[in-house]
Structure formats: C-alpha cells, structure tokens
Amino acid sequence: MSTPSIAPAPAPLVPALAAKPAISPSPGPGTPGSITSKEWVIPPRPKPGRKPATDTPPTKRKAQNRAAQRAFRERRAARVNELEEQIKKIEDEHEIHIAAFKEQITNLSREVEQCRSEMTWWRDRCHALEKEVSVERSAKEAIVKEFRSSLSDREAVRSDKGLAPLTTSTPQARSSDRPDNGDASNNDSGEGREEVPLGCNDCSTSHCQCIEDAFTMPGVVAQEQSRRLDTTKPGLSEPQIKPDPEEMEIDFTSRFAATQQQDQSPTSVSSPAVDPCGFCSDGTPCICAEMAAQEEQRPRRNSFENNRLAPIQNLSQFTPPPSDGDVRSDVTLPPISQATNPCANGPGTCAQCLADPRRTLFCKTLAASRSPSAAPSGCCGGKGADGGCCQSRNTNVSRGRSGSNNNTSSGSSAAPSLTLSCADAYTTLSRHPNFSRATDELSTWLPKLHTLPKPRDFPLTDRGVPRAALEVEAASVMGVLRYFDRRFADK
C-alpha cells in the first residue's frame, strides 16, 4: 500500500469541518482495481498562553461552582434593580414634597406681603387719626380759652356796673323765708338765682343785660348742663342707686291734723306779688315768675321730707314670736319642689333641655332608668322587698317590723345625702374633658347615677299626681367622674 500524499497549504484559522478526500494512487501491478480512502481532521492551532476551552467540565464540583456563581450574579443583579427602583421612587416622592413646600412657601410669602401692606395701611390710618385728634384737641383748647376770656370779660363788666351791693342785699332779705336744707348745691343754685337784679339802667326793649347775666351764672349753667344730660340719656332717667322702699314710707297720722297750717303757709308765701320786670310780655315765659314759683315750692318739699318715717331696722325687737294658737295645723301647703319644678310636663321639657339635644337625651334616659319597670339592680339582683336591694334601709318590711324606737334610731342613723339637680349633674359631667367620648357609652355609666326620690317610694295611688323634681346624689356624680378618668385615660 502506498501512503497518500498531502498537498502543501497554509494553516487555516478556522478548523476544517470536512476532511479532504485522499488522492487515489495509481494501481500497482499486484493489486489491480482496488481503491483505499481515509479522512483526516486537523485541530486548530491554540492561542498562545491560553488553555483550551472545554464545554463540559471535567468534574462535578466544578459544575456546581459554576452554577452557584451564576445564581449569585443573578441575585445580585436583581437586588441592584430593586434598589434602583426604590431610589427612583424615593426621588419622585422627594420631588413631590419639594414642589408642595415650594407652593406653600409662595402662598405664605404672598400672605406676608398682604399682611405687611395692611399693617402699613393701618399705621397710616392711625397717624391720620392721631393728627385729627390733635387738631380737635387744639381747637377745643382754643374754644375753652375763648370761653374763659369771655366769662372774665363779663365778670369785669358786672363789677364795673356796681352789681355787688345789690347781690349782697338780696340774700339777706330772703334768707329768713327759705329753710336751710344743708345741701351745698341747692344753696349755691339758690344764691345764684337770688343775685339777679330787678332792673338796671342798660336794659332796652330788645336787649336786657340783666337776663343775660342771670343765664351766665354758675348755678344756672350747671342746672342747664344737668338738664341736657338728662335729656340726652333716656336710659339713665332712673337713679342708679334706688332708695330702700322702707325709707320712702310716709307718716299720714299728722297729714290731716295740720291742714290749717298748710293752708296758711301758701298764703304767707304767695302774699307778696311778683314784681314785674317790665321786659316780659304776656305770651313769653318770665324768669322772675319762675323763680318766685320755685321759692313757693321749697317749703312744701321740706314739709314732705319732714313727714317721712324712719326705716324700721330692728323688727325682731317689736314683733313677738308666733304662738301655738297662731299656727293652723290643718293647712297643708304644696311642696316647693312641685312649684319650682321646671320639668313639670316631663323630663326634657324645660328651656335648657330644649336648647341642648344632649341634655334632653341625658334627662330622658336618666328618668327612664329610674322608672319602676327598670331591671333590678344591687348586690342581690333585686331580690329584696318591693324589687329593691336586700341592703336597703327604707324597705317596707323593715318599716313593718320595727317599732317606734327602731324607727327613731334608723332615722337618726340615716343622714340625708347631698344631692344635685338633674341640670347641675349634667353641667358637672359635661365639664369633663372626655365627656364627648363618654356620650357614645351612655348606657355604661348612666346606671351608676343614683337618683332621689326612688320610684318605689311613691305609692301606686299617687301615680297621677305630678312627681317631685329629679335629684342625683353627689357621691354618684363623683364616682362617674372618677370612672371617666379611668376609662378615658391616655395610655
């Protein structure tokens, strides 16, 4: 056999997938008609410094290591993706918060600017008002100075005209007819009125200096100002300090006995005729006549004040105590609770309940809970007499068995408990800070309130009679308040 010859060729970069067919040798003389063939595969030349890559690992441990590394890389990539998503979400929320804060800052800055503008406006307004007040004050001071200067000028004119002798002579002439009341204001006004002269040399038909001087007197000016104040203030027409009605009593014993003296006094006062001043016509009011009428009315006022009785201060010194015969035992007055019961038509009908729905619910529920048909309560569950507790002191059994001595001892031992009205109890409970939360659990704490009088104390024959006012024990109210503290305490 002859070996096949290989043609020289350059080394291929890619390994040959198909083998080249061998060159058929020429048939020899010994083997006529026979052909031989064989495929040859040439591996690629490996790169320098690298191991040949094999797809199948040589051992099982290496295969497990590769799988573990691949799983670790996958988990790490998934964790990185998850963290990236969280960071993106946090950034979005942060941007939303920043936008909201920026909007709030803009709104607050706008409000601050508005408040500043309003403050500047009010400051300018205050300055303007202060300027107006200062101008009015200066004008008022100028008017007061002018008025005082005019008064001083008039006083100087009066002193120059020689009015001083007349003014000193008239009070001495009329001081005997006027009684002394001890009032400084009345004396000043009376002296001011008496200083008016009956005439002067400067009076004419159209102008009288005497009348003007009379109007400018201090007493007349003060009386005119007080009269203006009374007319401008209708709400203060009544005196602020009202006198005691006992002090306003009048003694009528000598009223009709002194009729002759009263008849003579007006004649003596009205005997001097009014001296006409000559400047008052028939249709116009005359100052002289008015002053004379006031002088006539002063003695009447003094006599009226002298007839007043002194107030009876010590009534117990003169009134003896009532005797047994003065008191009638057959007279029975209605109890005060029925007369003063505002809920006579039933619980929840008073004005306070009609104004507050919660108060109405409280009163009606409390009245329903104390009705005789309510569930029995107490330590024994209502097994005592009349459906009450066995420890009750006011049962009918104890009343029937105990004698008079037992009744007196039990009555003295059972002291009356302090009670509150239904309205006061509701007001006390409503002032608790957690009362609004307690209204949702009304059925839990409302039975803890003990009411008086108890329904079993009323006889069956008196059901048609209006019942007494509802009273609540103060101790039970305190217990409910302590229950509120425990129940709604912040933990």
From Swiss-Prot:
Region (Disordered): 19-73, 149-196, 224-245, 397-416
InterPro entries attached to this UniProt entry: AP-1-like, bZIP, bZIP_sf, Hap4_TF_heteromerisation
Bias (Low complexity) ranges: 397-413
Keywords: Nucleus, Transcription, Transcription regulation
Subcellular location as annotated: Nucleus
Domain (bZIP): residue spans on this chain: 55-95
Record has Transcription regulation as a keyword: yes
Any one GO molecular function term: transcription cis-regulatory region binding
Induction conditions: Expression is repressed by iron. Expression is induced by the zinc cluster transcription factor acuM to stimulate expression of genes involved in both reductive iron assimilation and siderophore-mediated iron uptake.
Region described as Leucine-zipper: spans on this chain: 83-90
An individual GO BP term: ferricrocin biosynthetic process
Biased composition (Basic and acidic residues): 149-161
Cited Gene3D superfamilies: 1.20.5.170
Region Basic motif, residue ranges: 60-79
Pfam families: Hap4_Hap_bind (PF10297)
One GO cellular component, as annotated: RNA polymerase II transcription regulator complex
Primary localization class, coarse: nucleus
Phenotype of null mutants: Causes decreased production of triacetylfusarinine C (TAFC) but not fusarinine C (FsC). Attenuates virulence in a murine model of invasive aspergillosis. Also increases zinc sensitivity.
Function: Transcription factor required for repression of genes during iron starvation. Represses iron-dependent and mitochondrial-localized activities including respiration, TCA cycle, amino acid metabolism, iron-sulfur-cluster and heme biosynthesis. Iron starvation causes a massive remodeling of the amino acid pool and hapX is essential for the coordination of the production of siderophores and their precursor ornithine.
Family: Belongs to the bZIP family. YAP subfamily.
Protein name (database record): bZIP transcription factor hapX
Source species of the chain: Aspergillus fumigatus (strain ATCC MYA-4609 / CBS 101355 / FGSC A1100 / Af293)
